[in-house]
Every structure is written in C-alpha cells, then in structure tokens.
C-alpha cells in the first residue's frame, strides 16, 4: 500500500506518527475493532508493554487475514488506562512497534481512559487499514 503522507508544515514535525495518510483510490478499507493485549487463560494479566505488543500482534493478525501487510495500516487509536505507565515504558513500546511495523507510522492518537471493558486490560488498539491498493 502506498499512502501519501500528509504533514502540513504549520502543524510542526510529528515524531512517531503522521498527521494524515491519504489512501489510494484502488484500496479497500478494513476497519479493525479494538484489540486488547490479554492472553486467554492467563492467570494474571501481563504488564503494560507486553499487552501493547500482544494488541499489535492481534491487529496485524486481522490485517494479514484480509490480505494486507503492516504498512497497509493508515490510522490507529491507542487507548490506555495509565498514561504514566505508557510514558515509563516508551522504550519497550518503541521496540515492540519497530519489530512489527519498522518505520511505518500511521496517523495516530493516544487516549487515556478510566478503564477498558476487558478486566485487566491496560491497552486497546483500534485500527483502520487500506488493503489491496497500489504497492511500491
């Protein structure tokens, strides 16, 4: 998928995301429900960075099941229950990101919420991808 990256100079240079991703006309939209990082059957929920990595894996499972690749992701909203934990784990989160997405950064938002529906969930990731468009 080849997105046209849209980063107006008046908004400053983004770090770790892009302000806009213009999809090619020949792609198909894939809307991915919020994915959490809990492991089914685990006695204890994993920590923040482990949940983030697992949530990313689940997102990519859906993308790949639709015939896509990581760079097809055009938008991502990350919901966290503890912004301080996110900030404290930024190095580990960056490593998890690069292992899965490399240097592909979609348009992103990070939102702190009081809680998530799944008990023990610290992170939930909602995503939109464009599948089947023109690729380099």
Regions picked out by a protein language model, each given a short descriptive name:
Residues 1-74, 80-136:
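N-terminal presequence-like segments and the immediate start of the first folded domain
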């Amino acid at each position: 998928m080849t997105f046209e990256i849209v980063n107006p100079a008046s908004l400053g240079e983004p770090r770790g995301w892009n302000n806009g991703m213009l999809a090619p006309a020949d792609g198909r939209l894939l809307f991915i429900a919020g994915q959490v990082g809990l492991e089914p059957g685990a006695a204890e929920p994993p920590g923040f960075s482990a949940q983030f990595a697992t949530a990313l894996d689940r997102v990519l499972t859906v993308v790949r099941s639709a015939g896509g690749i990581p760079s097809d992701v055009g938008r991502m909203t990350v919901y966290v229950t503890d912004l301080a934990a996110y900030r404290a784990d930024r190095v580990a989160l960056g490593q998890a990101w690069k292992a899965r997405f490399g240097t592909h950064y979609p348009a992103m938002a990070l939102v702190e919420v009081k809680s998530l529906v799944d008990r023990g969930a610290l992170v939930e990731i909602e995503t939109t991808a464009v599948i089947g468009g023109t690729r380099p």
